[in-house]
Amino acid sequence: MGIEVGKRRLVYTTSRNNDRNLDFLKRRRIEDSSSSSDHEDNQRGSLSSSSSSEEDSDRDDSHVSLRQSVDDRDLEITKKREEILDTSEIKPIERQKKSYDDEQGDVDQICKWFMDRYKFPKILYASELLEKATPLLPIVRDMYRGLVDSHYKFEANEMRQSSQRAILSVQEFRNMDLTKFTAGYYGMKRQFQIGEVILQKYKSFLLRRQGDTMKWWGVSDFAHYVLAPEVLVSLCIKEMQLSDDVYDKNARERAYDIFVNTVKFGTLVADQSPLEPWEVTP
């Protein structure tokens, strides 16, 4: 029931209705309060998430901005100006150094192994070598007098007989196993020093006594690869005290065996050792 005033309708309610309305309002306030609290929590969570996202975004933006602020061309120019090597340029150098270190380590191990096994005398400088070997050079003549059976001369003759040519060709020389003509632990460098001295002292003597084998080899190569090792066999007998007599057949056989088994030391250790004292690095 009610009275209409203009367009507004006035409603008169009873006390019972008022009580119901009051209860309804209380419930609404409680619900509103709870809803408001949840809304504030959600809002705070949203704000926190938004803030975190903004911070992440800021960090990402700053990160991207930092990365994009350096031009690749500027880096290349700086590298060239400062002569800086990049990683791709450094790695090969590191590998090369490592490879060299490994190789040097192998040489040291080889040297120690042979020294422990054979008790070699010290590696001689050229002047020391010539001083010790010069008194032994007459064995070159004695080889042609039948006083010495030459192991290396026999090998040289075998090589000549297996060839189809009148003289040693370049290709045959390249294919030759020169370890058969290497004076073991003395190495090829010191062997050639002896070969040069032999040519200086005995070249005319050798030219007068050229047989088929020496002609096939040539006098120079014959002196370096056949005669020089025989002189060093005599020196080995002296230095390693295999016998008091360098013409002792058994002692020479022992020296030949030592040479055959120590070529690796000669090529990797002795040939890397300086011939002159001034070549030694401090």
Curated annotation (Swiss-Prot):
PANTHER family: RESTRICTION OF TELOMERE CAPPING PROTEIN 4
Residue stretches in coiled coil: none
Domain of life where this protein originates: Eukaryota
Cited Pfam families: RTC4 (PF14474)
Protein name, per record: Restriction of telomere capping protein 4
Annotated Basic and acidic residues bias: 22-43, 60-70
A GO cellular-component term linked to this record: nucleus
Family, similarity comment: Belongs to the RTC4 family.
Annotated compartments: Cytoplasm; Nucleus
Primary location class: cytoplasm
Record flagged with keyword Cytoplasm: yes
Tagged with keyword Mitochondrion: no
InterPro entries for this protein: RTC4 (IPR039024), RTC4_C (IPR028094)
